[in-house]
Amino acid sequence: GVTFASPMEEMDADLLLRQADQAMYQAKLAGKNRYCVFDAEQDRSVRGLHETLEEIRRALLTQQFVLYYQPKVNMRTGAVIGVEALLRWQHPEKGWLLPAAFLPLIEAHPLAVEVGEWVLGNALAQMSQWHAEGLHIAVSVNVGARQLQQRGFVERLAELLAAHPTLAPGDLDLEVMETRALQQLASVSAINMACREIGVSFALDDF
């Protein structure tokens, strides 16, 4: 692993050693008899991603995420036939963030499952509240590829539904995003069937 001391920056020996270690690790990943020069830009990018992941963890713990419900309207009759749950992040410094600003960063990270469960749990809680008020509204929820392919997804979904016994499972529609990231279509087909068996509608969003 190779690194260089920049005359423009104040750098101590410990920092140089850490940078050389990072470069050595990258060289080992590339194969035998390789060397790698420390990339400061890549390092900043990695640290930026790590900081964002920590912010998302904090957002889950401090209720910074919010769901909005967009009506789905029958164009013929004008009647509202359901709503779609839309995730927003009320960031304390950056303001309201759309999913495109943060969800792609966690597609391959376990946080994708945690955020997905938060969305499902809160959507079901809202459905229960509406049901108690006499409103029976079907809700569509987007599910990411990683969450869908997580072991025990259907069992966990059944647990979340069981926590809201007044709801009809058929009022929950799952729309699977990132279908290009689905790795095993046979297992996805089995999940589809299992969801339908417990009464939950299931659709592949861009398949």
Indicate where each model-derived feature is located.
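The catalytic core of metal-dependent phosphodiesterases that act on cyclic dinucleotides
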Residues: V139, L160-F207
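Cyclic nucleotide signaling catalytic output domains
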Residues: G1-M8, D12-A30, C36-E51, E55, ...
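Active-site core of bacterial EAL-family cyclic-dinucleotide phosphodiesterase domains
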Residues: V37, G48-L105, N142-A145, G170, ...
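Bacterial c-di-GMP phosphodiesterase catalytic domain signature
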Residues: H91-P92, I106, Q147-E159, L182-A190, ...
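Conserved catalytic/binding loops enriched for acidic/polar residues
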Residues: V119
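Catalytic-site/binding-pocket detector for metal-dependent nucleotidyl cyclases
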Residues: P110-L111
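Catalytic core regions of nucleotide second-messenger enzymes
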Residues: E9-M11, K28, G95, H131-I137, ...
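Regular, well-ordered alpha-helical segments
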Residues: Q22-Y25, L29, R58, S128-A132, ...
